[in-house]
């Protein structure tokens, strides 16, 4: 599995800010403050040629387009992306993999994401991060996320080796950031989303959602 992944350096090519802004305007209605915050992140990437040490946490009520923002950023970065749905991850082993001593052992979701992407530089879209601390199995999935977010390397129990994570960029969504532990919250720049008015929702449906459905 490790041999199937292209392990790249963390050097990041400059992003065209005009193209980035165009993508944001295509994908998102309004949200000027959010777009400006994303553009600031892009300027930082262009200045350092590395991904920021922090990820983005998009926090707001259901139906405000949090996931859409995450996908737009992944598109701007031109990186493969994978989704971690924390509401369905009940056991840390789902993330870390299981030891080879078990007959049903296999790599975890994180290692499988690297394998599917075929490279080490990718976006992890972590949906419902506020549900990460509600594990029902042997431990807390939130503790595993910390090792992924620290960019110091991630250990998969099945692979039995350290996986470089310097090329990982996490973008998380949450409804309630107060449910997220302080250590995890400190790894993100938080973007708060207001709820849309009924009139704005009508515009979004007619000018953004409906055309995309018809295009498919």
Question: What label would you give each PLM region?
Answer:
Residues 50-56, 120-122, 168:
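Pre-Walker A (Motif I) flank of P-loop NTPase domains
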Residues 125-164:
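Conserved catalytic/switch belt of AAA+ P-loop NTPases
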Residues 101-126, 157-162:
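Conserved alpha-helical scaffold flanking the Walker A/P-loop in AAA+ ATPase domains
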Residues 58-60, 97, 128:
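The Walker A (P-loop) glycine that initiates the GxxxxGKT/S ATP-binding motif of P-loop NTPases
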Residues 10, 118, 176-186, 190-216:
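Conserved C-terminal "switch" segment of AAA+ ATPases
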Residues 76-106, 113, 133, 200-201:
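AAA+/P-loop NTPase substrate/partner-engagement loops
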Residues 51-86, 115-116, 181-182:
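Walker A/P-loop
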Residues 1-59, 110, 210-211:
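Pre-Walker A (pre-P-loop) alpha-helix and adjacent loop at the N terminus of AAA/AAA+ ATPase modules
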């Amino acid at each position: 599995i490790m041999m199937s992944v292209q392990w790249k350096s963390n050097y990041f090519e400059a992003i065209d800010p005009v193209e980035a802004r165009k993508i944001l305007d295509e994908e998102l209605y309004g949200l000027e403050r959010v777009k400006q915050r994303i553009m600031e992140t892009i300027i930082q990437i262009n200045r350092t040629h590395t991904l920021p040490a922090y990820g983005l946490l998009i926090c707001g009520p259901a139906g405000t387009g949090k996931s859409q923002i995450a996908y737009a950023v992944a598109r701007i970065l031109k990186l493969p992306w994978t989704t971690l749905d924390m509401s369905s991850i009940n056991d840390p082993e789902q993330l870390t993999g299981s030891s080879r001593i078990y007959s049903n052992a296999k790599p975890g979701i994180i290692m499988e994401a690297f394998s599917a992407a075929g490279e080490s530089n990718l976006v992890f879209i972590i949906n419902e991060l506020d549900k990460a601390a509600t594990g029902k199995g042997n431990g807390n999935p939130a503790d595993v996320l910390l090792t992924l977010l620290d960019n110091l390397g991630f250990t998969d129990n099945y692979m039995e080796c350290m996986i470089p994570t310097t090329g990982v960029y996490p973008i998380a969504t949450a409804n309630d950031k107060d449910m997220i532990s302080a250590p995890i919250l400190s790894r993100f720049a938080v973007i708060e989303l207001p709820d849309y008015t009924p009139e704005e929702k009508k515009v979004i449906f007619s000018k953004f959602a409906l055309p995309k459905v018809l295009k498919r």
